């Protein structure tokens, strides 16, 4: 089985468009559909035909092009069961623990409520790929619009249980801001400082910072490091529950 091909490009202002292509079957999935034009140009540039859309949550900047792409390609739209009514063109709803096939490969659904109530991630265990959209960012997490911090912390624990070498594709190019914020709560983390410097250089050159890995996030993402003594001491939360430390970090980011 040949490796999947992945193309990443910008949509709107900072959304990532992601296409996942199987060179043997020709199957091509879009991870969300933020904007019609960039997706069509990417497909045309490769000579790919869209067969699937894997929707992660209902926000407009992730579903805007669902209907026009479905009308053009007759592709199959997957999306979260708990947000089914809000997903344009939905064909198959997916709940936590569901599994389906894409081009003969297993796709596992992980419910990650927090950013929205029904947000899901798509995990391809045999390929070591996680499509996390607006749950997990490089050195960050999604803003909590519909569920409390405790729910997002539970979602993060699910993702932290994946293999460290899992490649993570996220939904927005927020990495520079995330890195700068992470340094304010984890200033003594040498790995974080080195990564933040690399990100500064990459973004100055207009280079993307995607993908990341679960292992790298465990080392540098403050939301995954809530048990770290240095972070807790810096926040004045030495004896707090993990979920409370997570919530404090998210609150500080909201005001950063």
UniProtKB/Swiss-Prot annotation:
Is the keyword Zinc assigned to this protein?
A: yes
Looking up CDD domains in the UniProt record yields:
hydroxyacylglutathione_hydrolase_MBL-fold
Which GO biological process annotations does it have?
Answer: methylglyoxal catabolic process to D-lactate via S-lactoyl-glutathione
Residues reported to bind Zn(2+) 2: 61-62, 134, 172
Per UniProt, the keywords (alphabetical) are:
Hydrolase, Metal-binding, Zinc
User: What terms describe the molecular function in GO for this protein?
Assistant: hydroxyacylglutathione hydrolase activity; metal ion binding
According to the record, cofactor stoichiometry and binding are noted as: Binds 2 Zn(2+) ions per subunit.
Cofactor(s) listed: Zn(2+)
Pfam families recorded: HAGH_C (PF16123), Lactamase_B (PF00753)
InterPro entries attached here?
Clx_II_MBL (IPR035680), Glyoxalase_II_hydrolase (IPR050110), HAGH_C (IPR032282), Hydroxyacylglutathione_Hdrlase (IPR017782), Metallo-B-lactamas (IPR001279), RibonucZ/Hydroxyglut_hydro (IPR036866)
Might you give the EC number(s) for this enzyme? 3.1.2.6
According to its UniProt record, in which pathway does this protein act? Secondary metabolite metabolism; methylglyoxal degradation; (R)-lactate from methylglyoxal: step 2/2
Please describe the quaternary structure of this protein: Monomer.
Which function does this protein serve? Answer: Thiolesterase that catalyzes the hydrolysis of S-D-lactoyl-glutathione to form glutathione and D-lactic acid.
Question: What HAMAP family does its record include?
Answer: Glyoxalase_2
What this protein is called in its record is Hydroxyacylglutathione hydrolase
Q: Which organism is it from?
A: Agrobacterium fabrum (strain C58 / ATCC 33970)
Gene name, please?
A: gloB
């Amino acid at each position: 089985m040949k490796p999947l091909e992945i193309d990443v490009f910008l949509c709107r202002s900072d959304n990532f468009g992601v296409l996942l292509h199987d060179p043997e079957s020709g199957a091509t999935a879009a991870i969300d559909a933020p904007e019609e034009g960039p997706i069509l140009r990417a497909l045309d540039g490769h000579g790919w035909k869209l067969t699937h859309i894997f929707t992660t949550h209902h926000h407009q900047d992730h579903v805007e092009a669902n209907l026009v792409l479905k009308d053009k390609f007759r592709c199959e739209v997957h999306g979260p069961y708990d947000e089914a009514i809000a997903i344009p063109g939905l064909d198959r709803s997916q709940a936590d623990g569901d599994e389906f096939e894409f081009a003969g490969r297993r796709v596992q659904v992980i419910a990650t409520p927090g950013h929205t109530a029904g947000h899901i991630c798509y995990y391809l265990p045999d390929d070591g790929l996680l499509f996390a959209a607006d749950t997990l960012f490089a050195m960050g997490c999604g803003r909590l619009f519909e569920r409390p911090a405790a729910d997002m912390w539970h979602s993060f624990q699910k993702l932290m249980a994946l293999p460290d070498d899992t490649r993570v594709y996220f939904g927005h190019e927020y990495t520079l801001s995330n890195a700068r914020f992470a340094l304010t709560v984890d200033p003594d983390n040498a790995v974080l400082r080195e990564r933040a410097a690399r990100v500064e250089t990459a973004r100055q050159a207009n280079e993307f910072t995607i993908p990341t890995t679960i292992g790298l996030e465990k080392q540098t993402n403050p939301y995954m490091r809530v048990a770290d003594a240095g972070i807790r001491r810096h926040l004045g939360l030495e004896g707090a529950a993990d979920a409370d430390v997570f919530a404090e970090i998210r609150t500080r980011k909201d005001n950063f």
